[in-house]
């Protein structure tokens, strides 16, 4: 199998294409185009009758897609979150869907996008810079409790309260407008330790996830993807942290495995699975990590949609939605959680 151009190294490239099992005349959707590494691989396997739909909420990614694939009649390009993929494709019409979650390498590498604590830039963090509040705008008006809740829920940051108090105190003196300001402030209040991880890592992740509603989009997008797939279609999802992977894992299991039964209660209907798990967690091997260290935290999961049982829509048979981790933190809890 050919490899993507060296300018962009998509994670788990071969494993994604193997998981999707691209066919010559199939219809595929890349819900997170980025710089198109995986999309190029899909196109290599499509014939003249195949079709690829690409989506991204980032206008820079859409510009790259139009420049790269705008002349290819097999490709249609759509700006927007994959949470809205149901507005782009009809139900049960797609052979394979890829969701490559989180922030892209170009977003991290360009200081002006405001995602990186290692490169000074405007404190923005929006994947779609034309929509919603920037990180700076939110931090300027959120209460210390709201900031602490976000840092804990989306970054599992044990020092969330300490960091939140420091942010509120500092903004009273001067506005927080730059990524370096925030990163330095967080580092200054964190306990010294031996970790090689930057002290602002969890906080930047948490604020980014909140600003972009990433976990909300993921839950909505997984439901939409399942509805869009044909029977026999494949869903491949790459996650980069435990919050994302937990949602993906539980979603796939919910449609593939019967929930625990309660012997005291009669079963209204027998469970009919809608998905079959194709693989467990797939991670990058040492060869890939030597080329692309950012693949270290990537986890790929693949599932295949099954034929629905008679009289069972399949999509409504759930054990309940995954709770959103944006839950209030009991006031009695301190910084160590």
Swiss-Prot record:
Its main location: cytoplasm. S-adenosyl-L-methionine binds at residues 36-38, 56, 82, 100, 107. GO terms for molecular function: rRNA (cytosine-N4-)-methyltransferase activity. Pfam families: Methyltransf_5. It catalyses: cytidine(1402) in 16S rRNA + S-adenosyl-L-methionine = N(4)-methylcytidine(1402) in 16S rRNA + S-adenosyl-L-homocysteine + H(+). It comes from the Bacteria. HAMAP family: 16SrRNA_methyltr_H (MF_01007). This is Ribosomal RNA small subunit methyltransferase H. It comes from Xanthomonas oryzae pv. oryzae (strain PXO99A). The lineage of its organism: Bacteria, Pseudomonadati, Pseudomonadota, Gammaproteobacteria, Lysobacterales.
